[in-house]
């Protein structure tokens, strides 16, 4: 018998979904029944259903910071999304809503507020994303990953919890990861991740440097859907994937180094695994600059090296990887000196407290 019911929401990219999954086992241990509201065709639908969590879909418009003709029609989708979410919440009667952000979350948060249901949100990046900015007035508490984020949260709603780490990420097998890729143990392994949607510029630069890199390293390349290079399918020492789910813990365990974008959820997982990382944040041209702030924070802590997209030319990339290799010991030492509490436990505490105080 469940004590509580939580409806989770968040979507658009994997980064708005995987932290929710990290919380699910602990929520269930604390007596929560867990259900999910997402969009009709977002990445969250497949991820959540694959984890056997009841899923409700709503209409949702995209939140854009740039001009697009769809900006005129999407507000009506958001209004319909509020109506859809309200209908679901009326039927399900959750004790609390937990939001991880993304454009699908806004209608759910507003509907929960209208129904007087407490809302706890979580922001992974240093500065709140647009969805969480819009949601903040309707939230009881907004959990943050970086201490620097608290200054952006009004009305004493901010709580420093850190980023929830999926338990399965910590339990990967190095041997299994090497076996999946058919790698021998004679070379160190670099894992390249361009985010859940892939990154053309990172893909192109890695492949442009491939012959040089394969002299010293084996390469695992998660390149994004539709981005496989058929000419390299049989390349010895190079294993490419469009997207991985179940194999990810083993592939991460097999890696000695990680080259990645700088989304907060991912880099905190790398930190938990003590993996030296070269971060290539999304440029300000393609984002609001949050990944640049995340990456520089990790650089200042000694956890990572940073290479901006503008510097991403062949010689610079290869030299930066060699610099990462030479700094491996120092980076791991900095990571081992980190003081961190269990983020999942802290977030569960905030959720339970919000239910009792609302």
Curated annotation (Swiss-Prot):
What InterPro entries does its record include? GlcNAc_MurG, Glyco_trans_28_C, GlycoTrans_28_N
Entry's EC annotation: 2.4.1.227
> Which Gene Ontology CC terms are recorded?
plasma membrane
One Pfam entry for this protein is Glyco_transf_28
**Membrane-topology annotation of the record:** Peripheral membrane protein
Enzyme class comes to transferase
Q: Where in the cell is it found?
A: Cell membrane
Q: Which UniProt keywords apply?
A: Cell cycle, Cell division, Cell membrane, Cell shape, Cell wall biogenesis/degradation, Glycosyltransferase, Membrane, Peptidoglycan synthesis, Transferase
Q: Which HAMAP family is this protein grouped with? A: MurG
For this chain, the family text in UniProt reads: Belongs to the glycosyltransferase 28 family. MurG subfamily.
What the protein does?
Answer: Cell wall formation. Catalyzes the transfer of a GlcNAc subunit on undecaprenyl-pyrophosphoryl-MurNAc-pentapeptide (lipid intermediate I) to form undecaprenyl-pyrophosphoryl-MurNAc-(pentapeptide)GlcNAc (lipid intermediate II).
This chain's protein is named: UDP-N-acetylglucosamine--N-acetylmuramyl-(pentapeptide) pyrophosphoryl-undecaprenol N-acetylglucosamine transferase
What is this organism's lineage?
Bacteria, Bacillati, Bacillota, Clostridia, Eubacteriales
The gene that this protein is the product of is murG
């Amino acid at each position: 018998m469940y004590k509580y019911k939580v409806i989770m929401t968040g979507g658009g990219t994997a980064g708005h979904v995987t932290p929710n999954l990290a919380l699910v086992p602990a929520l269930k241990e604390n007596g929560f029944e867990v259900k999910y509201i997402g969009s009709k065709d977002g990445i969250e639908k497949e991820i959540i259903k694959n984890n056997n969590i009841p899923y409700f879909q709503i209409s949702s418009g995209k939140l854009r910071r740039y001009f697009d003709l769809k900006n005129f029609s999407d507000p009506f989708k958001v209004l319909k999304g509020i109506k859809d979410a309200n209908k679901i919440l009326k039927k399900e009667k959750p004790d609390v809503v937990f939001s991880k952000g993304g454009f699908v979350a806004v209608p759910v948060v507003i509907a929960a507020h209208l129904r007087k249901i407490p809302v706890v949100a979580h922001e992974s990046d240093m500065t709140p994303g647009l969805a969480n900015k819009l949601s903040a007035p309707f939230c009881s508490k907004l959990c943050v990953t970086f201490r620097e984020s608290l200054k952006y949260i009004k009305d004493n709603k901010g709580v420093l919890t850190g980023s929830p780490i999926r338990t399965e990420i910590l339990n990967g097998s190095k041997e299994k990861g090497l076996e999946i890729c058919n790698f021998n143990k004679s070379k160190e392994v670099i894992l390249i991740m361009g985010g859940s949607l892939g990154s053309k510029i990172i893909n192109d630069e890695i492949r442009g440097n491939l012959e040089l890199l394969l002299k010293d390293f084996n390469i695992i390349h998660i390149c994004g859907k539709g981005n496989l290079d058929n000419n390299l399918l049989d390349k010895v020492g190079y294993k490419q994937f469009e997207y991985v789910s179940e194999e990810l813990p083993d592939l991460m365990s097999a890696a000695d180094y990680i080259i990645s974008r700088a989304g907060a959820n991912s880099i905190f997982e790398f930190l938990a695994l003590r993996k030296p990382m070269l971060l290539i944040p999304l440029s300000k041209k393609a984002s609001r600059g949050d990944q640049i702030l995340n990456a520089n924070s990790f650089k200042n802590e000694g956890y990572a090296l940073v290479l901006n997209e503008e510097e991403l030319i062949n010689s610079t990339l290869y030299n930066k990887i060699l610099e990462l290799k030479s700094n491996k010991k120092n980076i791991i030492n900095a990571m081992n000196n980190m003081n961190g509490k269990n983020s999942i436990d802290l977030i569960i505490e905030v959720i339970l407290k919000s239910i009792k105080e609302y």
